[in-house]
């Protein structure tokens, strides 16, 4: 029955149709090489999480992607280091297209690919998928953060590892998403530094769920998931207090054990652990490498923000951006990235000597 009252969409000023995921897949199909890269990396990460593989997972790359050309150059460089250190590290490139904002700001390449507030999301989805096809086809597995709950249908077949950020770890929708995606997932501790929410999220994501979402055809549907066994915690610090140190690792491992979860811990070298100073990631890396070298198998992975050029830059209208430099959080430059990766690889080799049976991972 019609009514003279309008109660809906009162704050919506425009609605544009978005291209269906299946059409983007058909337009930019996954290649055999990309599929092989992604499937192999997922299995290797699973083996690291179960203790069958004693390497350390390294998720490394730009804070966010804004220039696909620079991203591909970074991927080519990283692939060479990945191959060189493959016996000790599993290196996966951080390819982040969505940025959670504390208040407002540029939300990432998918949301605003032209960096001009035109919000051409259809273009952003295509650029993101094309970049992932290119990167994974060259043998470089990709990692991303799942922020929007619809965009995974456009890109998830090309993702080897995913993150749920500190601001969304408590979200029921993201826990449900994590229970159904085909890749391993890391949950970050809260922005205030507490870990219980992340531990709860791990338990939730390991369980089956039933929820509403969109199919690749773009239709609303009820999704039923099996649960995801390949989930773990990421320590990123909080309230300007780091939690990468050995005492914090022990406390988190104990919290995981009390929840009957395997003590798999990834450490984010950036964010509150670096006090938001990108070069301090090297200090964090030195400390974490020492913990690994002394035999701690609970540290199964690390996350690093790195780019071709160090630091970050602000967008200035009419001014060309510096090639290969972040426009969001500051990153390590390439000249610091390679030595850090070698330091981590050396730590893994020392761990094999110090604790060959992995007895510190209970």
What residues fall within each predicted segment?
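Active-site-facing alpha/beta catalytic cores
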Residues: 2-9, 88-244, 248-249, 271-272, ...
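N- or domain-start disorder-to-order transition segments that initiate the globular core
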Residues: 9-49
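Acidic (Asp/Glu)-rich catalytic clusters
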Residues: 49-52, 82-86, 130-139, 225, ...
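Conserved phosphate/anionic-ligand binding catalytic regions in large, soluble enzymes, centered on
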Residues: 57-70, 329
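Conserved, mostly hydrophobic/aromatic
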Residues: 61, 267, 333
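Glycine-rich loop at the start of a catalytic domain that most often binds anionic cofactors/ligands
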Residues: 68-80, 103-110
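A contiguous, surface-oriented mixed alpha/beta subdomain in the mid-to-C-terminal portion of proteins
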Residues: 236-238, 243, 251-266
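Internal helix-turn-beta structural module
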Residues: 307-354
